[in-house]
Amino acid sequence: MIREHDTVVLASDLPDIGLKAGDVGTVVLVHPAGGCEVEFMTLGGETLAVVSLSVEQLRPIRTREIAHARQIDQTQH
C-alpha cells in the first residue's frame, strides 16, 4: 500500500516529461479512488515534475538498492 510521503520508484519511462524508469520520487497525495501524485526532484532540491500516476506505474524502494545520479535534459524542464 502506497502512503503519502513514501519514497517510490518509477516503473516505466515518461518521455514527455523526461522521467525514466528507476527515477525516485516522493508521494505527495494519495487519491481515494486510486493513484497518487508523485513529486520528482533533482538532487539539488529543484522540483522537476509533480505527476498523477497509477500504482501500477510505481513500485516501493527496496532495501538493497542504491540511488544513481543522472543529468537531466534542460529542454524538458
Predicted regions and their residues:
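Basic/aromatic-rich interaction segments and small domains that mediate binding to polyanionic partners
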Residues: I2-I66
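Long, low-complexity intrinsically disordered regions
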Residues: T63-H77
